Design a protein with these regions (language model features):
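Non-transmembrane, aqueous-exposed alpha-helical and coiled segments at domain scale
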Residues: 2-422
Length: 422
């Protein structure tokens, strides 16, 4: 049989807990690859009692002897990359041998960060809540064919290409009448670019396909979540890349028929960062409880996340678009003390009920809930699925019946060991 690339994806609005799961899954793989996104999303991993937030570096970095790839669909901020790599090096993880970067990955320039802030300021109250890292403007340049790529670092024309891009950006900033000072940022960026040149800068599409030909196992890890996908998410409150499974093909150069298992991660409830529609959002004390017990604050930004009940309409939509083969449920333990737990199984829009994710989500939409009795106990004391309380198993099996996909991994606590595999 042909080796295939397995994929792990968030099925909600990001922050599903991918860091921990990738940690549980990576031992099975020889190669771990990132295929989209930039340093806006942080994966929090605990390793030997230390906490690390990885933003652009794949999570396979903690397991020695693995190859980690930053694919062509990723955008890289040299400054943040250097900070991240140096912090890892200080704790004994030498990346220069373990990490390869695609020549075709795009670079976030200092002026991209400033453009991000300028565009957001110009929007006033219509902000989409960007993380201000320059990711949107970098993808804009990529699509309008003005971008700079990692491979340009190896070109004798590098300085000229940079100067042209910078001049273009300065023109835009002038028209937006935005005041800024770039000297310090630019100095850091040029130093960081020198640092980036030490790494293996490769034709990653050949590399990935060579690995498959050599029967190596590969895991592609997504950042963010399906409902933030530029095509299928709640546009315009989305990210600038394709976060769905198809993004693996375009972001790594893997053919669609070489995609294997698709692991879909979801939280037992829902959260969303920043602005944008969120049908099951709770504005009451229950929402506060989910946030506090679940420690729902951003890994990179520290922003408080909006919380709500599990949205089955959205989950089924994500499963369909990604072709999910196995589900992974995170943070079940957050609801250990709840008397009643709800799941949205349909939406009511203007007097009619639908189980489809609509083109537009507005204030008219009301979720239709199915109620469950809480399990009211600490799930960590059980070692096997069979031992779980009936109430919890009813919740899990309801999700399986509704989606038609098995829930294979259940996380019952923050620790790596607090994971039940079926």
């Amino acid at each position: 049989t042909m080796k295939k690339v397995d994929v792990i994806l968030g099925l909600q609005w990001g922050d599903e807990g991918k860091g921990k799961v990738v940690d549980v899954l990576t031992p099975r793989y020889e190669v771990v690859a990132r295929f989209q996104g930039g340093p806006n999303a942080g994966h929090t991993l605990e390793f030997n009692g230390e906490k690390y937030v990885l933003r652009s570096i794949p999570s396979g970095i903690f397991q020695g002897g693995k190859t980690n790839i930053i694919g062509n669909g990723v955008v890289i901020d040299a400054i943040l990359f250097r900070e991240e790599a140096e912090a890892l090096a200080a704790s004994g993880h030498d990346l220069t041998r373990q990490l390869c970067i695609s020549k075709k990955a795009h670079l976030i320039l200092p002026t991209h960060r400033i453009l991000d802030a300028a565009y957001e300021a110009a929007k006033g109250s219509a902000k989409i809540g960007t993380t201000g890292k320059g990711i949107g403007p970098t993808y804009t340049d990529k699509v309008s064919r003005n971008g700079m790529r990692v491979g340009d670092l190896l070109s004798p024309d590098f300085e000229r290409i940079y100067a042209a891009a910078k001049a273009r950006h300065e023109k835009i900033l002038k028209s937006l009448d935005y005041q800024y000072d770039i000297a310090e940022l630019e100095k850091q960026w040029f130093e960081a670019v020198e640092y980036l040149r030490r790494f293996h800068i490769i034709d990653s599409e050949y590399f990935v396909n060579d690995c498959l030909a050599q029967d190596k196992s590969i895991l592609a890890e997504g950042a963010q979540g399906t409902l933030l996908d530029v095509d299928f998410g709640s546009y315009p409150f989305v990210t600038s890349s394709n976060t769905v499974c198809a993004g693996v093909c375009t972001g790594l150069g893997v053919a669609p028929n070489r995609i294997g298992e698709v692991y879909g991660i979801f939280k037992a409830y829902c959260t969303r960062v920043g602005s944008g529609p969120f049908p099951t959002e709770l504005f009451d004390e229950t929402g506060e409880r989910l946030c506090d017990i679940g420690h729902e604050f951003g890994a990179v930004t520290g922003r408080r996340r909006r919380c709500g009940w599990l949205d089955m309409v959205a989950l089924k939509y994500s499963i369909m678009i990604n072709g999910v083969t196995q589900l992974i449920m995170m943070k079940s333990d957050v609801m250990n003390d709840f008397d009643t737990i709800k799941v949205a199984t349909a939406y009511e829009i203007g007097g009619r009920t639908t189980s489809e994710f609509p083109y537009e989500i507005d204030g008219e939409l009301k979720p239709v809930y199915t109620e469950f009795e809480g399990w009211k106990c600490d799930l960590r004391k059980y070692g096997r699925y069979e031992e779980f309380p009936e109430a919890f198993k009813r919740y899990v099996e309801f999700i399986e019946r509704q989606t038609g996909v098995p829930v294979k991994i259940i996380s019952v606590g923050p620790d790596r060991g607090e994971t039940i595999t079926r």
